[in-house]
Amino acid sequence: MEGVLLFWKYRALFFLVLCSLVLCKVHLSQASPTSQQHNDAASLSKIYPRGSHWAVGHLMGKKSIEEYPYAYDEADRSSAAVFSEGDKPSDGYQQWKESLLNLLKMIEVNEYRNSKAMREASVYNKKFSGAEDNNLKEMLDYLYQMMNMKENTSS
């Protein structure tokens, strides 16, 4: 129940986050190739069977050991740490979580300020003066008399 209330309270924010995630997913996904693109790729592979020749010469023999994801120790192939200490994948999740919590706190503070200003400036909190109170009593008395007259004439 609390999750539903939280969702309803921040529905605009959740909608914004959902839309941005969908747009990011659509932007990063690959489009399916058309038949013309497929034919172009097939014809290029026939011309250059080993790939693009323009980048072959200057990259030959320049593989770096630091960039290779595996470390070799006595012919044992074990995975090396690809991420440094500060770049763990969970840190990205923690950063997103912290930023969303900060955003929610800012929205909450903003809503509190707006509601406080509305309560202070509200017409409903205004006390009636003596003249307005008398006018209200006169109006209610007149309405009561009209209702009594209507009941008397109908019977």
Curated annotation (Swiss-Prot):
InterPro entries: Bombesin (IPR000874). One of its GO terms (molecular function) is neuropeptide hormone activity. The keyword Transmembrane does not apply. One of its GO terms (cellular component) is extracellular space. GO terms for biological process: neuropeptide signaling pathway; positive regulation of peptide hormone secretion; positive regulation of phospholipase C-activating G protein-coupled receptor signaling pathway. PROSITE patterns: BOMBESIN (PS00257). Keywords: Amidation, Cleavage on pair of basic residues, Cytoplasmic vesicle, Secreted, Signal. Pfam families: Bombesin. The modification Methionine amide is found at M60. This is Gastrin-releasing peptide. The lineage of its organism: Eukaryota, Metazoa, Chordata, Craniata, Vertebrata.
